[in-house]
Amino acid sequence: MGFDLATDLAARRRQHRYRQARIMDGPSGRHALLGGRQYLNFCSNDYLGLANDPAVVAAFQQGAADWGVGSGASHLVCGHQRPHQQLEEALAAHTGRQRALLFSTGYMANLGVMTALLSKGDAVFQDRLNHASLLDGGLLSGARFRRFPHNDGQALASQLARSEARRKLVVVDGVFSMDGDEAPLVDYAEACEGHDAWLMVDDAHGIGVLDAQGRGSVFTQGVNERVPVLMGTLGKGLGTAGAFVAGSDELIETLIQFARTFIYTTAMPAAVASATLVSLRKSREENWRRDTLAELIARFRQGARALGYTLMPSQTPIQPLLIGSDVDATALSEALREKGFLITAIRPPTVREGEARLRVTLSAAHEVEDVDALLAALAQCQTQDV
């Protein structure tokens, strides 16, 4: 058949799974401007409301004035500028680790770690609901790829016990991006320690949000010193862009030498690093942002439960409404959009068959009135049989 792309695209349309980017005409914050209309935005990952914070924006502008809008090269050529170094040192201190290394995206960080640490003869063990970048990194590493049931520490321990691999790496999300629940990191740390394995945690959705200082899930669960590899992103709780890996001096040196996604790509703009230095400090010091989030999460969950919606076991800003069919999830998303709310319907293959959902995300930029308005709109959709 060759490259029959039209057939593939037509099939995706029939499945109600055709993706299209919406062109936003303003910044992504509490509100979103789309097609000349302003919406309340409940699908951004800007959990702490830092993406449009005046101090963070000012730091970005000053960074661009001082360092230009591009780094000009990879880190190992001439693209590693002073703000990059300062941010790596700040992230290492923030996460209680010897060193940290910047990557352009979380996807590249995850691919870089696994392809640098693993090869044929090794094994990687992953939660079935891990992010696509973790799954791709495991497959690309050349290691034997094993998946265990979601959040099942006993199943993981059993797989580790049977493995005779040279190196064993367990990889999990700290907070799962589509369900919002947290991994049982204590169970995983114990399983790894009992079977000579390393634990890697992708805390993309925990950094900035969890822990009294925003240090993430490894701190809330008390396992930071038991997790050799920590990955975090800068574009969610911290409001900027990019990612980092934090760990021992030997780990970071290994990534510098062998992580192709670090070596062979242009460094992030120094202006982004400058802005992140400010957002990192604010995320650590401004506890009111996490307090606001906790209040909004509790209010939304109570209201959605009272309306009869099926919630996931999440206490994080990710609050999915489990709908079921792709058609119903899309219809509810569109109905809410007509009422002035922007919430994306998440469908397979991102989530499992029959588990399409509305991924509601809350931000410290939201007001209590915003959550109440969303709950009222959901109630109206029920009366309109949507």
UniProtKB/Swiss-Prot annotation:
Modified residues (N6-(pyridoxal phosphate)lysine): K236
Catalytic activity, EC: 2.3.1.47
Intrachain S-S bonds: none
Pathway it works in: Cofactor biosynthesis; biotin biosynthesis
SUPFAM superfamilies: PLP-dependent transferases (SSF53383)
Record key words, sorted: Biotin biosynthesis, Pyridoxal phosphate, Transferase
Origin superkingdom: Bacteria
CDD domains attached to this UniProt entry: KBL_like (cd06454)
GO molecular function, one term: pyridoxal phosphate binding
Role: Catalyzes the decarboxylative condensation of pimeloyl-[acyl-carrier protein] and L-alanine to produce 8-amino-7-oxononanoate (AON), [acyl-carrier protein], and carbon dioxide.
Protein name (record): 8-amino-7-oxononanoate synthase
Source species of the chain: Alcanivorax borkumensis (strain ATCC 700651 / DSM 11573 / NCIMB 13689 / SK2)
